[in-house]
C-alpha cells in the first residue's frame, strides 16, 4: 500500500432482491443514477484502452438500466473522440464487430435465463455483472462474455465472488453512484481490513506479550496442527506453542515450540494464563475423551480462544445451543 493512502473499509455485498430495494429507495431519479453509472463506465473504458481518441468501442446494449448505462458511456466516449458503435442486443448476430474494447451492457444482473453471447476476441468491460452470470450464485447461464474488468455499482453482488462469476468478472471495481447500502448484511473483508486487525508490534516487544497456544492435530491429521500453528505465527503471535493431544507435533513449523499434552487435554490453568490466546480444535479427531477435554478447556479458560474444526463438533455435541 502506498504511503499516505487511506485504508478501504469492508465492501458491502448485496443480493439482487436487496439491490432492487436499495434502488427503489434512492432519493434521486433513475436518470441521475444512470448518468453517474454511465460516466463511471466511460472512465473505466478510457483507463482500459489507455486513452480514447480514435479508439474503436462496441457497446452491446440491452433494453433495461444496464443498457442505458452502456448508452450513456457510448455518448461520453464519442465526445472524447472514440469511434463508438452501439449494438442492440435484440438484433445482434453471432459475432460482434472488431474493436479495441467491447462494453457488455446487455443484461447485467437482470438476466434469469441461459444466454449465448456473440463471439468476440476483443477485450471486454462488463457493466455491473457479466451478462449471463447468475447474480446470486455466480453460475454461468449459457455462454457469457468473459470480462477483463467489471464496473459494478454501490456494492458487490454475490455472483461476482462465487462460482464461475469470479473468473468471468475479471478485475472488479465498485463505484459509488449515490445509493445508500447501509442496510447490507454481508461484507467482503479486504486485505486492508485485516491489516487494521493485526496490531503493530512495538520494537521492544518480547514473545510472551502475544503468545498463542495451539491445541490441534491427531494421528493422520498432523498437517492441521502445523497449518494452525503457521496461521498463528502469521497473525502476529510472538511465541507459538503447539500441542497434539496424545501425540507429537511432527509437522510443526520450526519456530513453534512442541509441548506434550495427554488425550484428555489436561492443562494447568496457571500455564494457560501465560498466553494471550489459544487455538483449539483443528484436526483433533472424533475421540470422545478429546471432545470432553475440549469442552472442559473452553469452560475453564478465560483467555481469548479460536475454536475450529473438531473443536466445534465437540461443543455442538456436548453443549446446548
Task: List the model feature ranges, each with a label.
Residues 89, 129, 244-245:
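Active-site loop/turn elements of alpha/beta-hydrolase fold enzymes
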Residues 92-96, 135, 250, 315-316:
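Short secondary-structure boundary/hinge segments and terminal tails
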Residues 99-101, 106-186:
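Internal gly/pro-rich beta-alpha loop/helix module
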Residues 88-97, 110:
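Glycine-rich oxoanion-binding loops at beta->alpha junctions
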Residues 1-85, 101, 149, 160-321:
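Small-residue (G/A/S/T)-rich helix-start motifs and N-terminal tracts that mark the onset
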Amino acid at each position: 500500500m502506498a504511503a499516505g493512502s487511506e485504508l478501504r473499509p469492508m465492501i458491502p455485498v448485496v443480493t439482487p432482491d436487496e439491490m432492487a430495494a436499495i434502488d427503489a429507495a434512492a432519493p434521486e431519479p433513475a436518470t441521475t443514477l444512470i448518468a453517474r453509472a454511465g460516466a463511471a463506465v466511460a472512465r473505466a473504458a478510457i483507463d482500459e484502452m489507455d486513452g480514447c481518441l480514435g479508439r474503436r468501442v462496441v457497446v452491446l446494449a440491452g433494453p433495461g438500466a444496464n443498457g442505458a448505462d452502456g448508452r450513456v458511456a457510448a455518448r461520453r466516449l464519442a465526445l472524447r473522440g472514440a469511434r463508438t458503435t452501439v449494438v442492440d442486443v435484440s438484433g445482434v448476430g453471432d459475432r460482434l464487430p472488431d474493436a479495441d474494447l467491447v462494453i457488455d451492457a446487455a443484461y447485467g444482473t437482470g438476466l434469469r435465463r441461459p444466454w449465448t453471447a456473440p463471439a468476440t476476441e476483443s477485450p471486454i468491460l462488463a457493466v455491473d455483472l457479466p451478462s449471463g452470470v447468475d447474480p446470486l450464485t455466480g453460475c454461468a447461464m449459457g455462454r457469457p462474455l468473459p470480462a477483463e474488468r467489471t464496473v459494478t455499482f454501490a456494492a458487490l453482488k454475490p455472483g461476482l465472488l462465487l462460482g464461475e462469476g469470479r473468473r468471468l468478472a475479471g478485475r472488479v471495481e465498485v463505484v459509488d453512484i449515490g445509493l445508500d447500502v447501509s442496510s447490507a448484511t454481508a461484507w467482503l473483508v479486504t486485505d486492508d481490513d485485516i491489516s487494521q486487525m493485526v496490531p503493530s508490534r512495538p520494537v521492544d516487544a518480547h514473545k510472551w506479550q502475544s503468545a498463542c497456544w495451539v491445541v490441534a492435530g491427531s494421528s493422520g491429521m498432523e498437517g492441521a496442527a502445523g497449518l494452525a500453528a503457521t496461521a498463528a505465527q502469521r497473525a502476529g503471535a510472538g511465541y507459538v506453542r503447539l500441542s497434539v493431544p496424545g501425540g507429537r507435533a511432527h509437522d510443526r513449523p520450526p519456530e513453534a515450540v512442541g509441548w506434550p499434552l495427554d488425550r484428555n487435554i489436561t492443562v494447568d490453568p496457571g500455564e494457560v494464563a501465560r498466553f494471550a490466546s489459544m487455538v483449539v480444535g483443528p484436526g483433533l479427531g472424533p475421540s470422545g475423551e478429546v471432545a470432553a477435554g475440549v469442552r472442559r478447556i473452553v469452560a475453564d479458560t478465560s483467555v481469548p480462544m479460536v475454536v475450529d474444526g473438531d473443536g466445534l463438533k465437540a461443543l455442538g455435541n456436548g453443549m446446548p445451543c
